A protein has these predicted regions:
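Short acidic-hydrophobic, aromatic-tinged amphipathic segments that line or gate anion-handling sites
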Residues: 53, 109-112, 202
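Short glycine/serine/threonine/alanine-rich loop segments
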Residues: 49, 108, 166
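A transmembrane-helix-recognition feature enriched in membrane-embedded lipid enzymes
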Residues: 1-52, 101-102
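Catalytic core of membrane glycerolipid acyltransferases/transacylases, capturing the structured
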Residues: 17-29, 58-116
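Non-catalytic C-terminal accessory region of glycerolipid acyltransferases
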Residues: 120-232
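Generic preference for hydrophobic
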Residues: 53, 64, 87-88, 194-196
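A short beta-turn/loop motif at secondary-structure boundaries
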Residues: 55-59, 186-187
């Protein structure tokens, strides 16, 4: 059984790399965001995962905050949202050959965790993308979480949302690492639950709204885990 899961992971990973090549080859031929959307759908259809959506995507949302467990997470969001998403990711990923090109071409936003000027650059780049009608999309944990518990949220999301008084929509992805886990070389097809929570306007007078949001998202995750046998 493990051998089959490893072979499935190899197949899925190959498909993902092909999809990244597809982004590069089609980016200048298609209006944004279609190169990335087509690439994401190519992955979704080729590796046979589907989604079960709860709640409604807010058409007026300007920022998405999403929990992060798997490399599938970006592809999931790109297939369920028609919006032009601008992903915020650590700068080191932009420096990786090939993969960095896939992120820099669509004008995703790099962030340097140790840089004193990083937040200023983040604010400037975010404003530029918002002016282009794009949605700032972040994994506020900063990296993949494990063991069903979300990591503390980084403050960058709050800085941007507060500065521009953005309408924020939290989104909970359920157990995506159960289906694709690069550390275990594991993949299995499945139906992934996506929960759109209620959106809100960022209130900079509330210093704890981001940490409180993590608690709310964790509760949504825990409740879904407890009430839905398919997650076990």
């Amino acid at each position: 059984m493990k051998i089959f899961a490893h072979l499935s992971w190899l197949y899925a990973t190959t498909i993902i790399f092909i999809s990244l090549t597809l982004v590069i080859l089609t980016y200048w031929l298609l209006p944004r965001p279609y190169a990335r959307k087509i690439s994401a759908w190519f992955v979704r259809l080729s590796i046979f995962f589907s989604t079960d959506i709860q709640g409604v995507e807010d058409p007026a949302a300007q920022m998405y905050l999403i929990n992060h467990q798997s490399d599938l997470d970006i592809g999931i969001m790109e297939t369920i949202s028609k919006k032009d998403l601008s992903w915020v990711a650590k700068k080191e990923l932009f420096d990786v050959p090939f993969f960095g090109l896939v992120m820099s071409m669509p004008e995703d936003i790099p962030i340097e965790r140790q840089s004193k000027t990083s937040l200023l650059k983040l604010l400037k780049n975010s404003k530029d993308r918002l002016n282009k009608g794009r949605v700032i999309t972040m994994f506020p944990e900063g990296t993949r979480s494990r063991n069903f518990k979300m990591l503390p949220f980084k403050n960058g999301a709050k800085v941007v949302a507060d500065k521009y008084q953005l309408k924020v929509q939290p989104i909970v992805l359920m157990q995506t690492a159960k289906y694709y886990d690069i550390k275990r070389f594991y993949y299995k097809p499945g139906r992934i639950k996506v929960i759109f929570m209620d959106s809100f306007i960022a209130d900079k007078s509330d210093e704890k709204w981001l940490s409180n949001l993590r608690i709310k998202m964790q509760k949504v995750y825990d409740d879904e885990l407890s009430n839905n046998l398919s997650h076990r």
